[in-house]
Amino acid sequence: MISSNDFRTGTTIELDGAVWRVVEFLHVKPGKGSAFVRTKLKAVQSGNVVEKTFRAGEMLPQAILEKATLQHTYMEGEDYVFMDMGTYEETRLSAKQIGESRKYLKEGMEVNVVSWNDKPLEVELPNSVVLEIKETDPGVKGDTATGGTKPAILETGAQVMVPLFLSIGEKIKVDTRNDTYLGRENS
């Protein structure tokens, strides 16, 4: 059990048979009446976001999530197959469960798979990944790092804005949290 006073961004709770993650919270103490906590919750399974208000100090069941590092091995139809490299046990997740993470997911990549009650819920990518540029306008001599940007499509199909001097075939580091270019990858 967790008190609503202890909510932090990222805290997970069980509510109505589902797992919810606290996205935003605000402790409110009005001049008249009792204090309360206004929250914005995101359903881990579906991604739905709701606003909910709890009394200050209200006790709620905390969802205990388990994380396992698994390797993305292959796709079978619409399912992504992950393998525990220690036990060789396979875990399957649907494209819906993967969500936006699929635009950076490539075979052989190690990710954290989050489970609740032995059911996989979602995939947590590393903060940055190295991917190859597959499509972009050609780089022209004289383009500088301080100049503008252009769109580039990466090997996984993700699109990010990159500096003008980059060209097809180069490997770049991308931040998976906000889809931004971090730099060239020397390999």
Curated annotation (Swiss-Prot):
Offer a single GO CC term for the protein: cytoplasm
> Annotated pathway, please?
Protein biosynthesis; polypeptide chain elongation
Q: Which InterPro entries match?
A: Elong-fact-P_C, NA-bd_OB-fold, Rib_uL2_dom2, Transl_elong_fac_P/YeiP, Transl_elong_KOW-like, Transl_elong_P/YeiP_cen, Transl_elong_P/YeiP_CS, Transl_elongation_fac_P
KW Chaperone (keyword) present = no
A single GO BP term for this record reads:
peptide biosynthetic process
What Gene Ontology molecular function terms does this protein carry? translation elongation factor activity
Q: Name one Pfam family in it.
A: EFP_N
**Has the keyword Cytoplasm been applied to this entry?**
yes
Alphabetically list the UniProt keywords: Cytoplasm, Elongation factor, Protein biosynthesis
Its annotated compartments are:
Cytoplasm
NCBIfam families per the UniProt record, alphabetical: efp (TIGR00038), PRK00529.1 (NF001810)
The entry assigns this protein to a family as follows: Belongs to the elongation factor P family.
Its function? Answer: Involved in peptide bond synthesis. Stimulates efficient translation and peptide-bond synthesis on native or reconstituted 70S ribosomes in vitro. Probably functions indirectly by altering the affinity of the ribosome for aminoacyl-tRNA, thus increasing their reactivity as acceptors for peptidyl transferase.
> What's this protein's name?
Elongation factor P
Q: What is the primary gene name for this protein? A: efp
